[in-house]
């Protein structure tokens, strides 16, 4: 049975909101880009969604305090990587210390010099076409321009603060 609660204290509602979304499994992606100074930036996203097939559009959400935020302007490009369980370490790395995200040999320079993460299920080069700030966050809309498929793998999901793969019903 669902429990319904309305609280006078907004921090309690915030905690209920967070708990509800922890129960919502989401696919895991990594977004990489280049900052205005040419240095790489990236982050893990669980908000990736397709928006349209014609033209091919996708969306993701991000915090405006993200190290990649300065690159989110119309006309700039990003590479969106979809992940499987064997590439879970990329999700963890891109969600951790930003100074270590591009330390190592887990990526190569891709189109326009943007990092392409190795061993992902797919990657898509996209151009930022719209950015919609919402409070301290933003919805970013991109148009897919190119991409490639990697080796098949199951989906990587994030659920209850844990990375996992789907199981059959």
Located regions from the model:
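Basic, polyanion-binding surface patches
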Residues: 1-169
């Amino acid at each position: 049975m669902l429990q319904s609660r309305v609280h006078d204290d907004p921090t309690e509602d915030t905690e209920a909101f967070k708990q509800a979304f922890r129960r919502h499994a989401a696919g895991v992606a990594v977004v990489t880009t280049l900052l205005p100074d040419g240095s790489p930036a990236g982050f893990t996203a669980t908000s990736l969604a397709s928006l349209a097939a014609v033209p091919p559009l996708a969306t993701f959400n991000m915090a405006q305090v993200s190290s990649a935020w300065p690159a989110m302007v119309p006309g700039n490009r990003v590479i969106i990587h979809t992940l499987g369980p064997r590439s879970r370490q990329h999700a963890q790395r891109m969600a951790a210390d930003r100074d270590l995200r591009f330390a190592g040999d887990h990526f190569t320079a891709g189109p326009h010099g943007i990092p392409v993460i190795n061993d992902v299920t797919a990657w898509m080069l996209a151009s930022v076409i719209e950015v919609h700030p919402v409070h301290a966050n933003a919805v970013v809309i991109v148009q897919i321009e190119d991409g490639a498929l990697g080796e098949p793998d199951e989906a990587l999901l994030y659920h209850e603060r844990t990375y996992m793969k789907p199981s059959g019903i």
